[in-house]
């Protein structure tokens, strides 16, 4: 029973870490990354469709993304979707390929992005701590129901804390990497 609680807590903490990585990867650095356009939805036959389903996105060089649209008739819709996104990008089309140059980030914008990254990181840490609290509550419930001893409870809570510390450290590493990426480019 305790092993199941620990496994469940670790799985949920891993999901929180992956969610944080996903959120942070969408934050634009000066470097061209295809994942930057993942959140863009294109109006396609009356429905909002993810850009990834309608086009291939690759990094052409350090500051340019190339979007190759599968259906020529969608080029203007894809261009409009990129232009109206809140990413501040200005696409230009050439044949079936849309080039998206990334403007360099100003120092002020970099600092704003770092604040956003830190906020996302804090939310990730809160999510991990909530998982720890839930696991500890389950352990206390087992103690209350006399299914485990106090020694087992303390040992299990210490193990949950160790797992929590590991994931908090991983969050800090992800944040440090993203901050470095934002400031270096």
Swiss-Prot record:
Keyword Protein biosynthesis: yes
Example GO biological process: cytoplasmic translational termination
Keyword Plastid attributed: no
Swiss-Prot/TrEMBL keywords: Cytoplasm, Protein biosynthesis
Protein name: Ribosome-recycling factor
A GO cellular component annotation in the UniProt record: cytosol
Localization in the cell: Cytoplasm
Leader sequence residues: none
Source species of the chain: Haemophilus influenzae (strain 86-028NP)
One Gene Ontology MF term: ribosomal large subunit binding
Entry-linked InterPro entries: Ribosome_recyc_fac, Ribosome_recyc_fac_dom, RRF_sf
Pfam families: RRF (PF01765)
Function as written in the Swiss-Prot or TrEMBL entry: Responsible for the release of ribosomes from messenger RNA at the termination of protein biosynthesis. May increase the efficiency of translation by recycling ribosomes from one round of translation to another.
Family per similarity comment: Belongs to the RRF family.
